[in-house]
From Swiss-Prot:
It comes from Drosophila virilis. This is CCAAT/enhancer-binding protein. It comes from the Eukaryota. GO terms for molecular function: DNA-binding transcription factor activity, RNA polymerase II-specific; RNA polymerase II cis-regulatory region sequence-specific DNA binding. One of its GO terms (cellular component) is nucleus. Residues 359-370 have a biased composition (Basic and acidic residues). InterPro entries: bZIP, bZIP_sf, C/EBP.
Amino acid sequence: MLNMESPQMYADAVQTLAHVDLKKQPQPLPQQATIGQITLTAMSSAQQQQQQQQQQQQQQQQQQQQQQQVTTDANNNATVQDAALLVKQHAMQQMQLSNNNSNNLLQKQMLQQYSTQTDLDELTTQEITLDLQHLIDDQFRDTETLGIFSDMVTSPGGLSATLPPSGMVSAAAKVLQQQQQTLANARQQQHSYGRAALAYMRQAVHSNATYNNHSSDENSSVGSDSSSTIKEEPIDPDYRRHLQESVTGQAAAAFINNSNGLYNAYQSNNLSNNNSSSNNSSNNSSNNSSNSNTNSTNAAQFTNLTTANVLAHHSLPHLTANTAQQLLKHHSKLQQTQQQHAQQQQQHAQQQHRKHSNKHVDKGTEEYRRRRERNNIAVRKSREKAKVRSKEVEERVKSLLKEKDALLRQLSEMTNELSLHKQIYMQLMNHTNPEVSRVCRSFLNTNEHAL
């Protein structure tokens, strides 16, 4: 047999043998043909498998390249986002630094203003010596002397004496006085000041107060005739009027209530007088005649004094006219917005009520159709009547215009006749006959008066 090295050589040998057999024998063998076909199909299938493997390898390479591109794009996007975040963080840090710097500057300015105001107050305040013996004696006088705390705010001179010269808080002080007068009756049975309460208080008590003290002690430093008066500049009436017009009662009351307890003054009126009448009755019986004579003058002794929490420019150096006005304006704006919001809500509620109050009408019923027909007929009739009226009015206007033209023509004719008559009479006046001239003059005068 033949030694075959490759399938191709085997196939060629098979074909040659087949041809030889065909030449020798007229009938071919079926087995040899099937073997050749099998070998050919095996060869083609092997080649197809190789091609499929190559295609799969190419597809895998393409997929790997696409994955690499996706990963590179994601990395690029991540780097861009990181850079944007870094820029934002840097901007936020700069904003925080600028805000901190501005806050520090504002705090420094506020401290400087406060220090300057306190320095000015220390320079402008007058030193008034206190009569301690007289103050101690005042605590055990009659019932009127113990009412100084309630009279400090409610008295007309108490607030006017402590107002600063510029009148920066006059409106707020007036509102405070009104509020305390209204709350005094409600709190009359709850609060009371004891006998041991001092007749003077700290801070802004002796800033602008006027003392009319008549001491019973001969060795006291303040005599009966000594009184310290402080002259103040008059408040500008225009400025006061402007404050009174701009400040409403509700806004000022809300401003006082919302000012973090700056105006927690003594809000009782004549409380200590009512609570200490029984205690002072025994003390008045044991006092000397000189003390009894000075009771009337000691009643209004410290009425001009103010407490530490009452509006005073010494105890509140940070409160200025501009800040008070700004707060009041802000509160008034808030009230206006609240009122507008309430009105809008009310209108909306009314509209909804009207919508719900309308009856549901079925448009498919005969009654609805009859009503619609009646309404249409009424509308048509009213339109026809309006057209007729408009035509009548137009005709009337035309007739009136014609009458006006005729009257104007008559008027022009009459004026022409009058001018002719005047010319004739003027010529006749120059006539030699005096009687004719006299008649013409009288006629002209009567015509002028008639005209």
